[in-house]
Structure formats: structure tokens, C-alpha cells
């Protein structure tokens, strides 16, 4: 079962074998958390939204056709869940402690390395937070979630060329902001 593609697993879930959702959860929980965390900056809310995305995958499994990539469909659902959350909590969005995120990504490193990593993550997160939601989303999908431009175009309902331009501009803007914060 571990060798089944994501599409094959989701098609089984669609056919009623909902136990297969556990494998998809194992494969994508951390990636979805990373996407949502980079967009929101709130570890606890991001974890809750991951659960909501998987709930919606089950609820709307009948809409999965298997024609496109499972990841594209999943991130489309995640964008909708995120948009709903932001609308509902417009006035309470805040960025959580870097320590929460550093704990999530973990790793056994020394105290000095850990502190430096946390500082770099904090600076990067601050820079990402200053980007527009569109620029932040395209960077998170391309750089952190490692989606191909073609997949991002389908998720965002735009062209591959437009995605390339947005990523390039967003990277330049992020670099400028990061260097400004660092100095």
C-alpha cells in the first residue's frame, strides 16, 4: 500500500476505502502544516487547519477525479480552508513564537546552532510576513512545499508564466526585506 501513488490512494478513498486516508495524512501532514504555518504564522491554528483540510478531503472526496495531481487538489482545498479561516479571524491574526515552529521542525543540534537556526527562522518568518498574501503564498508553494510551477498555476488558477514572474518578483522582494531586517 505504501507504493500506491497519491492519486491511487485518493481514488480508493473516494470509492469508500476511507482507511487509506491515514497514508495520505502520513505523507502530507507536515507539508500542509508548513504551508499553513508560513501563511498564518500560528502553529496551533495551522495544526487545526491541517485537520480541517483532511476533513474536507473526506467530505469532498467525490470531487476528486484523478485526472490531475492529488497535491494540486489538496492545496486547492487548503487555500480554501485558509481563506475561510482568515475571513473568520480577520482581527485576531498574529504570528506565534518562533520556538513553536522550531520545535515542529526539530532536529538534534547543539544549543548555539539551535539559537542561530531560530534567529534565521525568525528573520525569514518576519520577512515572509511582510510580503503580500499572494507573494507569500506563491513562495511557500514553490520554495517550501516544492510544487512545480505547473502545479502552482493549477492551484492558483493562473498560467505557468504568471507563476514564474510572481515567484521571481516575490523572491526579490523577500531578499530585500530579509536584508533590511537582518541589518
What are the functions of these language-model segments?
Residues 1-31, 129, 176, 180-183:
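N-terminal module of bacterial RNA polymerase sigma factors
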Residues 34, 48-55, 68-80:
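Structural recognition of an alpha-helix C-terminal capping motif at a helix-to-coil junction
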Residues 59-66, 76-96, 117:
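Arg/Lys-rich amphipathic alpha helix in sigma70-family domain 2
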Residues 83, 87, 135, 144, ...:
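DNA-recognition helix of helix-turn-helix
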Amino acid at each position: 500500500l505504501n507504493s500506491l501513488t497519491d492519486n491511487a490512494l485518493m481514488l480508493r478513498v473516494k470509492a469508500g476505502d476511507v482507511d487509506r486516508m491515514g497514508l495520505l495524512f502520513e505523507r502530507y501532514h507536515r507539508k500542509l502544516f508548513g504551508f499553513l504555518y508560513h501563511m498564518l504564522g500560528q502553529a496551533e491554528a495551522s495544526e487545526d487547519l491541517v485537520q480541517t483540510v483532511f476533513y474536507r478531503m473526506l467530505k469532498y472526496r467525490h470531487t476528486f477525479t484523478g485526472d490531475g495531481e492529488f497535491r494540486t487538489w489538496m492545496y486547492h482545498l487548503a487555500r480554501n480552508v485558509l481563506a475561510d479561516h482568515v475571513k473568520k479571524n480577520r482581527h485576531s491574526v498574529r504570528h506565534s513564537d518562533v520556538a513553536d515552529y522550531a520545535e515542529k521542525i526539530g532536529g538534534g543540534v547543539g544549543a548555539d546552532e539551535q539559537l542561530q537556526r531560530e534567529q534565521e527562522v525568525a528573520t525569514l518568518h518576519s520577512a515572509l510576513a511582510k510580503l503580500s498574501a499572494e507573494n507569500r503564498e506563491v513562495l511557500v508553494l514553490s520554495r517550501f512545499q516544492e510544487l512545480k510551477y505547473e502545479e502552482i498555476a493549477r492551484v492558483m488558477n493562473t498560467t505557468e508564466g504568471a507563476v514564474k514572474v510572481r515567484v521571481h518578483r516575490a523572491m526579490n522582494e523577500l531578499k530585500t526585506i530579509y536584508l533590511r531586517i537582518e541589518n
